[in-house]
Every structure is written in structure tokens, then in C-alpha cells.
Amino acid sequence: MSYFTIQNEDLPQGFTFRPHDKIYDSLWEMMDDGYFPSTIPLKTTINGVDMPSVGWLEVDEGLYDILIDGLDVLRPTDEEMIVSATGWPLEKNRALILNFFRNLRMDIIGTYTLQRSFITIMSIVLFGDQNPRLRRKKRSRVSLGKMLFDLALRMRSKIRRMKLTEVQVTGQNLVKDLCLLHILDLQKRLVTRGTIAEKRFFTAIEQAPCNYEPKRYGMKKKHMNFMFESDRKNLTVHPTLVNLEEHWITFESARERLLDTTFTKDWPVVGSL
């Protein structure tokens, strides 16, 4: 099977399965309402979660291409440079999750092997990376469904610690989004070390009629009106700290445009997802 099944007893008190008629922008929004999916797909998206993770747009194109091509094509020194920057959830530097992502993305190995690999990674998130024997012992005491629920909680906590938004990582594909968090954490470390330049991109949100009545700041004619409160704050921060979350939520066409796979030649990262 290319999915994991959740049982009723796997969910904590106060949670139940998502009704078929309820659709959410993110898995986190679904959980806030006390619901959880009955299945977690390995390769496809979770039913009932509508918005993809736009955080993939922040992954450096060169780094992404390297991960898809495989680390073994690099010179040993370059491979070591990337592997040494791996972090959460790993406590020991290695290419475990990077290789898993490539195998998942390129469909290189069978579904059963992919599932076992993901369970190992999930066990590391929940039970630590230092003692494999102790980790396996703890894993044997917990159902797979409960592990998946706890994994979602850990990932949401990591999103907040990384100061990401729940639009950047929506949980629509929980398996891929775990890889996304790992890759963004890796990329941040590479930027800090000066290995790659910080990626900055600017988006032009297309003009559209808006029913929102913007707040007025002051009475002078030169004062600007803003569609969103975040627009005013964005004028005072560094470009890398600009918050476009309200734009992503409001303008569905902007999300579709940014994630459109027809832009393969112009934007290989998006086209390759």
C-alpha cells in the first residue's frame, strides 16, 4: 500500500476523523478543528487539505538539482560539505533524509522499502537519533497511527521554531513536508556558512478587485492605504523578512501561478516537484 492507515484508537481524546465535506487550507487548520485524516499517503496529498506548501519555492534551485541528481555525483569534498550541514531531526550528520527524498521524488525504489525508510525517519523524529536499539524498543510500543499523529505535532512545532508560516508548510503531503523542513534547515545552515547565497525572490501579485476596506492612517493625502495590515509592516523590514502570507491566502491565482509546473525551464525547482 502507498499510504498509512490511522485507527480511531490512535487519536487522542477530542480528535476524530475529518468529515468528507470539510476542506481545509492546511493539516494544521484541520487539527485545530479536532480532526485528522484517516489515511496519510506516502506519495500523494492528504484528502481534505487544499493548499500546497509554498515553502518549496524557497529552496535554492542549485541545491534542489543536486539532491535530485544524487549526492554521489559530487566530488567527495562537496558531498561532505552538504552532508555535514544536515540537521533536524538527525543528531548525527548523514544523508538519510536527502537520499529518501530523492528515492521518493524519482520513484527509484519500491513502495515497501520507501515505507520502511519513512518509518525509520519518523522514529528518529519522535524517539531520537543517538541509540538505535532504544529507538526500536520505543517504536515497538507505539502504533503506527499514533506515531503519525505525534509526527504532525512535532512538525508543527518545528515550523514555529523555524519561524515559518503554516502557508509555507501546510502538511498537504506530510511525508514530503518533513523532507522540506529538513532541506530548509540544511539550506539555512549552508547560507550561514557562506556555502550558498541567501535566496531572495520578489513576487508581483496581480491586480484584482478587492472588497476589503483598507484602514486609513492619518488624514494627509500623501498617506498610503494598504490592502492588508502586513503590507504596512513590510515597508519597515528587510526584504528577506517580508510577510506575504495574507496575499497567498487571498489570491488563489497567485498560488496557482507560483506552483504552475509549466514553468519548468524558467523555474526548475517548481517544475520538478
Curated annotation (Swiss-Prot):
Compartments, record wording: Host cytoplasm
Top-level taxon in the UniProt lineage: Viruses
Protein name (Swiss-Prot/TrEMBL): Non-structural protein NS-S
Gene Ontology terms: biological process: symbiont-mediated suppression of host cytoplasmic pattern recognition receptor signaling pathway via inhibition of MAVS activity
Chief location: host cell
Transmembrane segment boundaries: none
A GO CC term attached to the entry: host cell cytoplasm
Function: Acts as a weak IFN antagonist.
The protein's assembly and partners: Interacts with host MAVS; this interaction weakly inhibits the host IFN response.
Keywords, sorted A to Z: Host cytoplasm, Host-virus interaction, Inhibition of host innate immune response by virus, Inhibition of host MAVS by virus, Inhibition of host RLR pathway by virus, Viral immunoevasion
UniProt record similarity statement: Belongs to the phlebovirus NS-S protein family.
Organism: Uukuniemi virus (strain S23) (UUKV)
